C-alpha cells in the first residue's frame, strides 16, 4: 500500500499569518488563487497579502474562480500566473480555489491546457502549492486530486497525480468561523462522505482507516454544533481537523460510489458538491451495507452509537440510520427534484456515474440500472 500526505502541515489558531514565511521557502512571487469575493470580504485576503509582503514575497491575486472551477478558470489562471512571473502558488478558500490552483500549478510546469491531462499524467511536479482551506470539507489541502468542470462536455474531470499534492497545508480554524450554516453543513457532509467512503474502500489500509475513523468521530461530534453556532471554536477546530484527516485518507484510499454519482449532478445541474453528497450518502450506504457489515459496525461505534448486544447486521443498520440522522439535522435539502434535477436525465446521470473511476473503489460494484434506482429513490 502507498500512503500519501502533505510534507508540511501547520495547524492552529492564527497560523494563517505563517503563509509568507512558508512561501519564501519556494519563491519570490506568489499567485494567490481564490474565489470571487468571500476571501476579500472576510479580511483573510488582506492577512495573507500582508504576510507575504512582510516575508519579501510579492503577490498577484487571481480571484476569478467560481463555485465549481472550470477548465477556463484553470487555463486562464495559468496564463495569468505566467504573465506575472509567479514561482509559487498560494491557494486560499474552499475546495474550488484549491482544486483550481492544483491545475494551474500543473500547467505552469508542464504546459498545455488542463484537458490535456484528463487521461495523461503530467511529467513534472506542479509549481509548489501552499493550501489554506477556509471551509472544512474537501480536504483538498491534503489530496492528489483536482476536480475541474469541462463546461463544453458537461463533465467533471478528475485530475489525479502525486505531483499536485500541496507542499504546505495551513489549517487555521479561526478563519472558518464566518462560514454560513448552509456551507458549513454541505462541506461538513462532504468530509463525512470522504471519511466513510475511504473506510469502506476496497483499497483501505490500516493507516487510512485510522484517519477515516477519527474523522468520522470528530464530524459526528461537531458538525451540528458548528452548523448551529459558527463561533463555536471547538466545533470549528474539530471539523477542520476532520476534513484534513478525511482528505489524507482519500489520498490513498479514494472516494467511491457516492462521488461517482454526485459529480454528474454537479456537472449537469450545478448542485453544490457537498449537498449532492449529503443527499446521496445514506442511501448509497444502505446499498453498500450488506457488502461489508463489519466495517459499518466500526462506523457506528465511531459515531458514538451504542451497539452493545447488537448483531453485526443490526450494528450496520444503526450506522446507516446515524448517517441519515446527521444529514436530517443539518437541514440540507433531501430530494434531487428540489435542486432542478429532471427525471428524464436520470439515465444519463447513471451512465456518467457508472463510467466514473470512483465506482471501481466501491465495496459493491453496481450496474447502471442499480445506480438509476438509487437516483430515483431520492428524486
Write out the residue ranges for each language-model feature.
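ATP/NTP phosphate-donor binding region
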Residues: 1-88, 336
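Short, amphipathic C-terminal "tail helix"
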Residues: 342-379
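Short glycine/serine/threonine-rich phosphate/pyrophosphate-binding segments
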Residues: 16-19, 41-44, 71-73, 96-102, ...
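Glycine/threonine-rich beta-strand-loop-alpha-helix active-site module
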Residues: 72-174
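Gly/Pro-rich interdomain helix-loop hinge
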Residues: 268-345
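Carboxylate- and glycine-rich phosphate/diphosphate-binding segment that chelates Mg2+/Mn2+
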Residues: 145-253
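Glycine-rich phosphate/pyrophosphate-binding beta-alpha loops
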Residues: 137, 244-277, 356-360
